[in-house]
Amino acid sequence: MNGTEGINFYVPLSNKTGLVRSPFEYPQYYLADPWKFKVLSFYMFFLIAAGMPLNGLTLFVTFQHKKLRQPLNYILVNLAAANLVTVCCGFTVTFYASWYAYFVFGPIGCAIEGFFATIGGQVALWSLVVLAIERYIVICKPMGNFRFSATHAIMGIAFTWFMALACAGPPLFGWSRFIPEGMQCSCGPDYYTLNPDFHNESYVIYMFIVHFTVPMVVIFFSYGRLVCKVREAAAQQQESATTQKAEKEVTRMVILMVLGFLLAWTPYAATAIWIFTNRGAAFSVTFMTIPAFFSKSSSIYNPIIYVLLNKQFRNCMVTTICCGKNPFGDEDVSSSVSQSKTEVSSVSSSQVAPA
């Protein structure tokens, strides 16, 4: 084996030289130069400094402006809430571990960090599934003129958290475990060992099928059908030009959110699959460190995409930041809502094709 397995950890370095030390007790400077750990800590500080205000402001603006409290926006608020929890409860632990180059908080801290990182990623993924299904049902109309109500949105939110807990919870109760990965400063499920006490293999298979492959299939199927429907409607002029543009704008926003998720998480998933299918193979510590830390950037993608592409939300945010005034001359947000082609919530509650 080209790595060293210990109690609650696996270091991708053979201990023939006697250098390997527990990542819960000693700095891991034998794995990488000290400056590399500092780079990771500064990167985590950036994500915390950006993620807290972006997601916090998203929640605050939504609760402050009644016009934003529409069914489809519930799912987007759910994303922001999950990101904020992950930043506060997970990223802060990762930052501290990176600064000291080992998990100061021990196996419990590792489990906490791994749990919240998994929760954040899974809530984001299943929220995108809910949005994809909503887009498919409302635009493709397999159920007729469907109205996406508050009840549907709340059920969707409950579903995202149930599925996220179904993925992040088992390692806390003995089905697999969370262990340090890469440079031993962030934690994730155990893809590395075949420890029979934790049944890692069955958990990893379950996770990749139920919590990655299935949602990806649903998302791609929904948007594949959606794109065909939008093109068909445009060709036949079934809807007004305003409605068609609204459909395209809202759909573009959600598709960009999906692409942002894939950009952040696909490298990590691909690396984890390779490690899982090539247990014992040699790989450098940076091989898992880079995708593991890069995946955490997803916590700041969605608020940025939402602000850039949702005119109503953007106006409300500017008004909130500027204490009730919009210096860009678009102060009458309520009137702009009725005219905006990119506004998500009003489109989502209509009985026409856009959500």
UniProtKB/Swiss-Prot annotation:
GO cellular component: membrane
Tissues of expression: In this lizard the color pigments are found in the rod-shaped photoreceptor cells which have been derived from ancestral cone-like photoreceptors.
Assigned keywords, A-Z: Chromophore, Disulfide bond, G-protein coupled receptor, Glycoprotein, Membrane, Phosphoprotein, Photoreceptor protein, Receptor, Retinal protein, Sensory transduction, Transducer, Transmembrane, Transmembrane helix, Vision
UniProt KW Phosphoprotein keyword: yes
Protein modification: Phosphorylated on some or all of the serine and threonine residues present in the C-terminal region.
One BP annotation, GO: visual perception
Function, as annotated: Visual pigments are the light-absorbing molecules that mediate vision. They consist of an apoprotein, opsin, covalently linked to cis-retinal.
Membrane-traversing stretches: 37-61, 74-98, 114-133, 153-176, 203-230, 253-276, 285-309
Segments on the Cytoplasmic side according to the record's topology features: 62-73, 134-152, 231-252, 310-355
Topology relative to the membrane: Multi-pass membrane protein
Disulphide bonds in the chain: C110-C187
Known glycosylation sites: N2, N15, N200
The protein's name: Blue-sensitive opsin P467
Localization terms from the record: Membrane
The organism of origin for this protein: Gekko gecko (Tokay gecko)
Low complexity bias: start-end ranges: 334-355
Record region (Disordered): 333-355
Family membership noted in the UniProt record: Belongs to the G-protein coupled receptor 1 family. Opsin subfamily.
Modification type N6-(retinylidene)lysine: residues: K296
Gene Ontology MF terms in the entry: G protein-coupled receptor activity; photoreceptor activity
Position of the signal peptide: none
InterPro entries: GPCR_opsins (IPR050125), GPCR_Rhodpsn (IPR000276), GPCR_Rhodpsn_7TM (IPR017452), Opsin (IPR001760), Retinal_BS (IPR027430), Rhodopsin (IPR000732), Rhodopsin_N (IPR019477)
Extracellular side: 1-36, 99-113, 177-202, 277-284
